[in-house]
Amino acid sequence: LVGSEMCIRDRPESTLMSELKPIMKDYPNVAITSYVKPTNIELRLTIIAGAHADIKATFDRVTKAILKKEQQYYLGMGNDFNLANEVVGLLKQQKLKITGAESLTGGLFQSTICSIPGASAIFDGGFVTYAAEAKISLLGIPASLINQNGVVSSATAQAMADYSRKKLDADFGIGFTGVAGPDELEGQPAGTVWIGLARKGQPTISKQLRLAGYLGRQEIRLLSVQYGLQMLLKELRK
């Protein structure tokens, strides 16, 4: 048997497999299996060696057909695919810099970026602003914005991304705010997360996550970082 892996994000497993069923009918000797991971779905393509004269060509055709259908949800190839490595690589290729402001993740995003060799080319520094007072004093976010919208909000996540980007004159700024748990914050349950993403010259966007509170603090923080990296990857591939 010869296999190949592909990572897909933001797709319900049943929807994804239903969409791929017509494609796979054209390749009866290729089996497709899905594995649900915390932040993505891993597709494994398997073919019996010798079933085709050119195994690689068959995989290439199947992969191309799947990508044509699911390109906007595609993360990368291989079971050792590293999302942070991909993001850092694209930032370097495009000569862009990133910074961030983190609340619930407590610097985990910045640590993840810095774990990749060559990160100094795309990262000058960032902020850990755990308390509301730090968001105000270090980033310059107006107290009125936080008082009106709350710490755990789209507005605050976007402001964290905006103000951190402007402070360090970076191309990208990313902000993480939310509830790592186990207790609620501002009436929001554990697992509620907002991620803001600012890019120079473009409107700032945000994404809300509703992660299961039973996952625990560390899992919620880790998943938040992975979803933030996915947002970045999507922007860098535009």
Model-derived regions, located:
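Short amphipathic alpha-helix segments
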Residues: 11-30
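Short amphipathic alpha-helical segments
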Residues: 4, 39-43, 207
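Terminal amphipathic helices with adjacent charged low-complexity linkers/tails
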Residues: 37-60
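Short alpha-helical segments enriched in small residues
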Residues: 54-238
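A short linear hydrophobic-aromatic micro-motif
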Residues: 28-34, 171-175
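Short beta-strand elements
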Residues: 34-36, 47, 193-199
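Short, small-residue-biased leader/transition segments that mark boundaries at the very start
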Residues: 1-8
